[in-house]
């Protein structure tokens, strides 16, 4: 049977079982057409807008007939979502066409339905048989596993049974004088913090750009967006910045450190990887502690700080909890117990679960496996990769409670909704998925911009904002894609910074802040109008990663209210608790 036959079979199958006749009133057809037009998945409004005037798809106000629509089913592959999900019958198409005419203000001639039915029957006579092609053994093998359903149906648990908790013997290897405060916080005000590195991309900046040689901690005013102060860290403490993190009480910031120092104070090539603890007022390091891995991301977790890591030492952890009071690694999880490599980790707003983005081993040594795999997909070396998945960790028992494979490669980022019903996963393979947390069911998967990385929900959780970094592809992405969270369709593609990396909703729920580690800037968007408000240049355009907001109450008591992991300390615009500043 030809492709056209299969499509037309769907269209005409309802003729015998759908007893709608020409006597049905025009009003009834229009009403039925409206229901179909606005169906959530597969409905016309998704692409053509609720009025039919066009969104991503063109305007329909010319009044397409049912035959025009069927022609698009055959000729336009994008329309397959309609035939698969809406599955319209002959009478459905008649109703849709009448409804579109009502939207366009065109005449609703009672003779049209009968005319259209005759045209649809005539259309069948134009069908031609589909040609048959020989399939190779490779193609047959690929067909057996090409659908995501086969991943779910054959999934086997990767993690060990029981607790995956392990410990790491952290050591304090450096203490430093905190110095003098660089600014004086005011009661009732909110401040943003940013760790800034030395690895911006000169090619996307101005002629003669010279990168900084020192990492910095920057603090600014959340209301005015202006930088207040910054401090350059000693070059001997330099490493590659990938995150900004803060203790729950807003007193201490954390930054990636080099390997532990040798006798002369320079990093020891054979030493353990370290992290720096910095005073949030003086902006200077006070402690250097071994953590057994190069720091990647960090976020508040209960009264501790949760980190995930890049390169692990032999005894290092893929994720760990850090005690800001005792300055020690309490423990965490090793990759080997998870059955794959931990990339990033994300808690829900109540800290009830930790969701680890997991990578299959073997595409490169150690934790580089996922990045290497997806890079080779973009470069054409690989046609497919082994599955990536989400591991659901109970932080009270430290058992892996569930594993959910995802339809994409190398998950970078995840956002859990305020109801803790769904997790939005953003993949380097230029797609994102909405996953039901109760059972791992994929609600939708939608396309993003090239090589996405970070993401954030808007305040009412109707939009997922995604930073299109170019991860794995070319690292020159410069857009922000916005997806409708109900159906996963893109609604906007915004101009952004080169290598836009993280995007976060501000604590007031009104702005989206996007950090660029290519330009060394922060772009701030109005979350409602989507307009770019200001750009904030980091000192010397050092690369910007992550964001933290710290609020001081009327008594001058500090609290971290937002970081890249979630909102904290009672602030959450999605729960009706925005911070007014």
Predicted regions, residues:
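Repeated scaffold domains used in trafficking and secretory/extracellular systems
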Residues: 175-183, 238-245, 291-302, 339-347, ...
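Gly/Gly-Pro-rich "capping" loops immediately C-terminal to redox-active cysteine motifs
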Residues: 31-36, 46-84
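Flexible coil segments in periplasmic/lumen-exposed cytochrome c-class electron-transfer proteins
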Residues: 25-31, 41-43, 50, 82-196, ...
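Short, conserved, GDST-rich strand-edge loop motifs in beta-rich repeat architectures
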Residues: 191-212, 256-271, 309-312, 356-385, ...
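A short beta-strand motif characteristic of beta-propeller blades
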Residues: 168-174, 226-235, 284-289, 328-335, ...
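Short loop/turn segments that connect beta-strands within beta-propeller blades
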Residues: 222-225, 279-283, 323-327, 394-398, ...
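Blade-level signature of beta-propeller repeat domains, shared across WD40, Kelch, NHL, RCC1
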Residues: 515-581
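Short coil/turn segments that connect the beta-strands within blades of beta-propeller domains
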Residues: 188-190, 249-251, 302-304, 350-352, ...
């Amino acid at each position: 049977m030809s492709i056209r036959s299969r499509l037309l079979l769907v269209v005409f199958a309802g003729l015998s079982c759908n007893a709608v006749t020409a006597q049905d009133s025009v009003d009834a057809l229009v009403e039925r057409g409206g229901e179909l037009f606005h169906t959530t998945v597969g409905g016309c409004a998704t692409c053509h807008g609720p009025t039919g005037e066009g969104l991503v798809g063109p305007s329909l106000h010319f009044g397409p007939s049912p035959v025009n629509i069927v022609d698009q089913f055959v000729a336009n592959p994008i329309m397959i979502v309609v035939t698969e999900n809406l599955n319209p019958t002959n009478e459905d198409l008649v109703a849709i066409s009448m409804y579109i005419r009502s939207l366009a203000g065109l005449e609703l001639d009672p003779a049209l339905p009968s005319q259209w039915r005759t045209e649809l029957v005539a259309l069948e006579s134009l069908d031609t048989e589909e040609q048959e092609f020989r399939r190779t053994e490779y193609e047959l093998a690929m067909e057996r596993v090409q659908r995501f359903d086969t991943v779910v149906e054959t999934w086997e648990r990767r993690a060990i049974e029981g607790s995956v908790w392990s410990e790491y013997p952290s050591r304090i290897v450096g203490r430093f004088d905190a110095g003098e405060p660089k600014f004086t916080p005011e009661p009732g005000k909110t401040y943003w913090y940013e760790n800034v590195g030395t690895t911006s991309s000169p090619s996307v900046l101005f002629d003669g750009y010279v990168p900084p040689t020192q990492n910095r901690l920057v603090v600014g005013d959340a209301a005015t967006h202006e930088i207040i102060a910054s401090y350059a860290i000693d070059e001997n403490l330099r490493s590659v910045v990938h995150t900004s993190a803060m203790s729950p009480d807003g007193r201490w910031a954390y930054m990636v450190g080099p390997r532990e120092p040798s006798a002369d104070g320079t990093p020891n090539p054979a030493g353990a990887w370290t992290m720096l603890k910095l005073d949030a007022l003086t902006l200077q390091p006070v402690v250097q502690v071994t953590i057994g891995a190069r720091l990647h991301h960090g976020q508040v977790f209960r009264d501790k700080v949760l980190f995930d890591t890049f390169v692990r030492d032999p005894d290092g952890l893929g994720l760990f909890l850090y005690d800001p009071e005792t300055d020690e690694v309490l423990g965490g999880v090793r990759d080997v117990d998870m059955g794959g490599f931990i990339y990033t980790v994300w808690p829900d707003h109540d800290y009830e679960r930790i969701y680890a983005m997991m990578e299959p081993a073997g595409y490169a040594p150690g934790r580089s496996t996922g990045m290497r795999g997806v890079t080779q997909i973009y470069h054409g070396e690989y046609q497919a990769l082994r599955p990536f998945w989400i591991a659901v960790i109970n932080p009270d028992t430290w058992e892996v409670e569930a594993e959910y494979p995802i339809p994409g490669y190398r998950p970078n980022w995840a956002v859990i909704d305020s109801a803790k019903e769904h997790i939005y996963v953003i993949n380097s393979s230029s797609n994102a998925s909405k996953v039901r947390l109760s059972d791992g069911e994929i609600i939708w998967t939608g396309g993003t911009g090239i090589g996405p990385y970070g993401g954030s929900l808007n305040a009412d959780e109707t939009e997922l904002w995604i930073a299109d970094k170019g991860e794995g592809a070319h690292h020159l992405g410069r857009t922000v894609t916005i997806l409708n969270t109900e159906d996963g369709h893109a609604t906007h593609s915004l101009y952004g910074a080169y290598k836009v990396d993280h995007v976060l909703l501000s604590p007031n729920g009104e702005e989206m802040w996007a950090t660029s580690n290519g330009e060394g800037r922060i772009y701030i968007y109005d979350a409602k109008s989507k307009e770019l408000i200001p750009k904030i240049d980091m000192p010397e355009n050092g690369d910007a990663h992550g964001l933290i907001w710290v609020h001081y109450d009327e008594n001058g008591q500090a609290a971290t209210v937002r970081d890249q992991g979630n909102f904290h300390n009672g602030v959450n615009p999605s729960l009706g608790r925005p911070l007014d500043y």
